[in-house]
Amino acid sequence: MAKLHDYYKSSVVAELTKEFSYTSVMQVPRVEKITLNMGVGEAINDKKLLENAAADMAIISGQKPLITKARKSVAGFKIREGYPIGCKVTLRGERMWEFLERLISIALPRVRDFRGVSAKSFDGRGNYSMGVREQIIFPEIDYDKVDRVRGLDITITTSANTDAEGRALLAAFNFPIP
């Protein structure tokens, strides 16, 4: 079991129950899933770019990504419906906790000029979305084997009802929100 999951069960639940005066342990917000998304618009011309992006995503997440396809044709972007244009991974359970632990303790501190993540990125329902400009902040990615620096979107979905509850949950994990 991941250390962060143990920490959540042992101290975060009690801390949040006291802070928000929940009557039941089941009311305490929890992390439900983490979704990683990498849009590779250049994959229209070169299929190898999408394969490399999917390989990077598999290394970062520990599971095989789903190739996302264009929902509709857009002439301005030169894409047709059904073209593969990105990849995504949904992490749940142990892999989710391990990824969150690596993100907080290893990956985010490796970002250049890092001053914390934006507090405005909550969606109103306690979920948090952020973008990472470089996939090389993850220690699993070998810098010498990277063909191109790509960014990815990370969405942390929680069972919190409000942004305040979601912020308190992530702050309890020492998530760097100012």
Swiss-Prot record:
Keyword Transport in record? no
A Pfam family (short name) is Ribosomal_L5_C
Signal sequence, start to end: none
A GO term from the CC aspect: ribonucleoprotein complex
A GO MF annotation of the entry reads: rRNA binding
Q: Name one GO biological process term.
A: translation
* Protein family: Belongs to the universal ribosomal protein uL5 family.
Summary of the function given for this chain in its UniProt record: This is one of the proteins that bind and probably mediate the attachment of the 5S RNA into the large ribosomal subunit, where it forms part of the central protuberance. In the 70S ribosome it contacts protein S13 of the 30S subunit (bridge B1b), connecting the 2 subunits; this bridge is implicated in subunit movement. Contacts the P site tRNA; the 5S rRNA and some of its associated proteins might help stabilize positioning of ribosome-bound tRNAs.
**The protein, known as:** Large ribosomal subunit protein uL5
Q: Per UniProt, what is the name of the gene that codes for the protein in this document?
A: rplE
